[in-house]
Amino acid sequence: MIRFGNPSSSDKRRQRCRSWYWGGLLLLWAVAETRADIHYATVYWLEAEKSFQIKDVLDKNGDAYGYYNDAIQSTGWGILEIKAGYGNQPISNEILMYAAGFLEGYLTASHMSDHFANLFPLMIKNVIIEQKVKDFIQKQDEWTRQQIKNNKDDPFWRNAGYVIAQLDGLYMGNVEWAKRQKRTPLTDFEISFLNAIGDLLDLIPALHSELRKSDFRSMPDVSRIYQWDMGHCSALIKVLPGYENIYFAHSSWFTYAATLRIYKHLDFRITDPQTKTGRASFSSYPGLFGSLDDFYILGSGLIMLQTTNSVFNLSLLKKVVPESLFAWERVRIANMMADSGKTWAETFEKQNSGTYNNQYMILDTKKIKLQRSLEDGTLYIIEQVPKLVKYSDQTKVLRNGYWPSYNIPFDKEIYNMSGYGEYVQRHGLEFSYEMAPRAKIFRRDQGKVTDMESMKFIMRYNNYKEDPYAKHNPCNTICCRQDLDRRTPVPAGCYDSKVADISMAAKFTAYAINGPPVEKGLPVFSWVHFNKTKHQGLPESYNFDFVTMKPVL
């Protein structure tokens, strides 16, 4: 039995911040034996006692119930499914979200600790940066909670409150699991760090004194200080010539230390007229509420994909301030509140943090009439830099057959503001939107996509030894293998692919594979060659197949 009145020192800030929500709650626990691979659990809200109770059973009468299937070593993926708000009693949206977050933290706490242990030393290189990041995240968190408290009648901030309630639940679920296991739980900051991984890709350079001295940077400037680049991905939306089908897919690029993967199916019965959906299926990671990749199938009929854009113009990053919402928070809010590409963009642009500056693709399946038409508004493209979000309907481009995305801004204003024009002048046309290697490969090969297998093939494509556009560079292709670079091999590159079509999306279903590509005779990646990089809880080698991801509850 734990009372909020006696927090440990590491818990005090979060409990002060959430006092407007949860002051006086009492947590009660009923603990049962845990199964080895699939762990079921149910959270109950006890209204009379103002307390929560958890049992290691799957009870559909509970306020949040679900399971975690830990198959990472055998298939490359864990699978988490949670339903909340479908029990036999009415509960508030805040309690619903807290219960859902708590259940996720409880079920996945062990892998949350592994994921943090693997990524923190790669992202944070010294105590000065660590303290700057902690200070920024604390100020941002306090500002966010104050805005939620001050704007309870504003639909945007009300939905932001749901996200923060879920975050608080995640923290407490992790704490209680750790107490049961006699383990040290992740701290407040560590959970915030995990959720802000994408935002940190821009926030850390923004806080780094050496990079702030100039107004322009090159990628080697970042690589010299960190062992990761700006985080790249490949995405493709493919329309068959007669509109017979539409395929969509995404392949993530980042450090291989991030390959502790969880595919999540979440279904939250939020009763708010401004919340269009509480349902989403998406690729993700332990402790993260967002996809990060991004690859989402949403209950509103929207599909969301994302690839990262670099910001070479450092003067933009100097505008990053804590009085804003991180990208991961705004994505969650937009995913809940929007029912079209335009409303998603209009929601997402609010309180722009200027961190995790990406291209977002919103595909509205409600506007797709197979073998007939793609209505205006089928595809919206949204791009962000600090202080600016641009968006436009690009359905006319999609009608020509495909939309590719490969880490270079499409919008001319975003492209120029980010410094790509100057970067191309310095480093060549391969960094331009039209002439990048992946632009050429997508342009050449997208016509070969005729079915699901050919869509999988293009998203795993790496023929760097023979493809003239790759020029023998294992990262000048759709699915990078930076570990195969002869000059500077590092355990980073393309480590997954997620693929689906319109009919699968209607069932919240996709195919997903974890691990660097092995097509065209490429060797299976193994950590034995990179043991200096921490890889706690990860498979020793990656030779997995595609897994069908489908909710079952």
From Swiss-Prot:
| Lipid metabolism found in the keyword field | yes
Query: Does the keyword field hold Signal?
Result: yes
* GO cellular component terms, A-Z: extracellular region
Matching entries from Gene3D superfamilies are given as: 3.60.60.20, Phospholipase B-like, domain 1, Phospholipase B-like, domain 2
**What enzyme class is recorded for this protein?**
hydrolase
The EC code for this enzyme is 3.1.1.-
Q: Where in the cell is it found?
A: Secreted
Q: Which GO terms describe its biological process?
A: killing of cells of another organism; phospholipid catabolic process
Annotated protein name in UniProt: Phospholipase B
Q: Source species, please? A: Crotalus adamanteus
